């Protein structure tokens, strides 16, 4: 039995609430993932601003927006967009299809390593994981 999982994004549905400077964390991700589309840049910025505004940002270890359409863009953690295991970047293994709407494993051997260690990176009895 295999479990099919498709990881998609709906970031293009977000709308910016107005002008202003781009948040430094959003800009770091935009730069690392080479996001050039202004709508996606605005949506990423708004996502970061909103997560911070609702005091959710500091509670998260990793966020993977799956924007940019390639494995090279999809691998970056919005919280720490460095290309290192310690920054919880994704390493895709097996077969994957990457597109502007997200990433889909092949259903046979596709998986991604987050490098998040449950015993050291996550708090006991205070953890939530979403896919």
Show which residues each predicted segment covers.
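Extracytoplasmic low-complexity segments
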Residues: 2-129
